[in-house]
Amino acid sequence: MLCQFLMKKTILVSSCLLGCKVRYDKTSKPLPKEQLIALEEKFNLVGVCPEVLGGLPCPRQPAEISRDREVLTQSGQVLSTFFLKGAHKALNICKNYGIQLAVLKSKSPSCGFGKIYDGTFSGCLINGNGITSDLLLKNGVKVINESELDAWLKTVKE
């Protein structure tokens, strides 16, 4: 078993995609079973929720990133410190495990990659990345979201 673990690369995965109820509304958004099995066959998975790592509870108020990159709740509470703390903890996990790829939850103010909510709580999406995705990318960790997973898995060598 240890030998098998050592032979596989390790990747970071948003905990909510693994079925953990860590989202702001205390739900999960699990990957389809087939995708999860394919990931587990090829990789060691390390689940993280940067928001929880940063000290936020479940449930919590939804948050979005404002134009000036502050993370705010709809009531105006500033959560940037929690998000940054969680992002740095996720980066440290990547460094400690030699992780070079993260599969993160789309649209999230922490994990979103490519598209995030615009900060107005209107449901509108804009181009951009979440706090954790940005930090990982700046430190050489490749980031994809769950909608890109099938295409990416096809490129992975056995």
Ranges and model annotations:
Residues 26-29, 117-123:
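Short glycine-enriched, charge-decorated loop/helix-capping segments at active-site entrances
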Residues 4-6, 53, 61-89, 93, ...:
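Divalent-metal-activated hydrolytic enzyme cores
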Residues 16, 105-108, 148:
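Short, well-ordered beta-to-alpha junction loops that form the rim of enzyme active sites
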Residues 19-25:
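Short N-terminal binding/cap micro-motifs at the start of the first secondary-structure element
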